[in-house]
Amino acid sequence: MTKNRLHTIEAVTNGIWLALIESYPKLVRFDAPKIVLCNRLTRTAGKNYQEENRIHLGNKFFLNNHSAMMLEILPHEIAHQADFNLFGLSEKRCGHGKKWCEIMVKLGLPANKYHSLTI
């Protein structure tokens, strides 16, 4: 089941990444982030490791929140990776800064910092 789930998540990730490339052509130089399902995430639904181009998603959250994970959490984390690839890190910017918010708007999503999902 996890292998099928991961395949689906990777397909959605690639679709989101391609949509972002249309808005931000510079992203074509970067691969879509690699997705890892992680059983260790119990409070955080997703975590982006920007320099490794990798996103960890809480596997346990999928049991009760599959749609929200695919429609909210995954794009949220992909937006972090796109923000990093396009604009880099800045001590003056937090992870949910203006550029990240703009990317979320391009995805047609609210720029929420936190989730309310339960395991």
Predicted features along the sequence, with ranges:
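Active-site-proximal or metal-binding-adjacent scaffold patches in catalytic folds
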Residues: 1-72, 81-119
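Walker B catalytic acidic pair
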Residues: 77
